Amino acid sequence: MPRPYEIVAPLTVYEVLRRMRRLHRQDVEHFLHRLVDRPALSGDFEAPADDGRIHQVKIVGGWIVSYWIDHAACEVRVTSLEFIE
């Protein structure tokens, strides 16, 4: 049985999630659950990051979720969660 993927994110991402309105938080959490189930799921576009990796970027409601997949560790690395202004 393959090892399940897990979400890994900096504390700042969890703080943003905690402060979100319930409906927005549910939308983002639903996307993250889908991503854990299907880590090959692509974002809306890709963007280079300072660490040299190409990050997937997904627009969820009014929020931008940036992430990359560490297949070796079975982790979804969420790097940022920002409101679109």
Enumerate the language-model features and the residues they cover.
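Short, charged/polar low-complexity linear motifs in solvent-exposed/disordered segments
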Residues: H33-L35, F83-I84
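Short proline/glycine- and basic residue-enriched helix-capping loop/turn segments at helix->loop/beta transitions
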Residues: V36-L41
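Basic/aromatic recognition patch in beta-strand/loop cores that engages polyanionic ligands
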Residues: D44-E85
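Arg/Lys-rich, positively charged N-terminal/basic patches that mediate binding to nucleic acids
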Residues: M1-H33
